From Swiss-Prot:
Record-linked SUPFAM superfamilies: Subunit XII of photosystem I reaction centre, PsaM
Keywords: Cyanelle, Membrane, Photosynthesis, Photosystem I, Plastid, Thylakoid, Transmembrane, Transmembrane helix
GO biological-process terms attached to the record: photosynthesis
Coiled-coil blocks: none
Segments crossing the lipid bilayer: 7-26
Domain of life: Eukaryota
Keyword Transmembrane helix: yes
Subcellular location: Plastid, Cyanelle thylakoid membrane
InterPro entries to which the protein is assigned, alphabetical: PSI_PsaM, PSI_PsaM_sf
Name of the molecule in the record: Photosystem I reaction center subunit XII
GO-annotated cellular components: cyanelle thylakoid membrane; photosystem I
Length: 31
């Protein structure tokens, strides 16, 4: 069983690149 800290870290590592990619896609879509 993973510790809560490990789960949170894994989620953060997975979400941050996704959010950055989404923001980049939205910025490119505007132009």
């Amino acid at each position: 069983m993973l510790a809560d800290g490990q789960i949170f870290t894994a989620l953060a590592v997975a979400l941050v690149p996704g959010i950055l990619a989404l923001r980049l896609a939205l910025e490119l879509y505007k132009f």
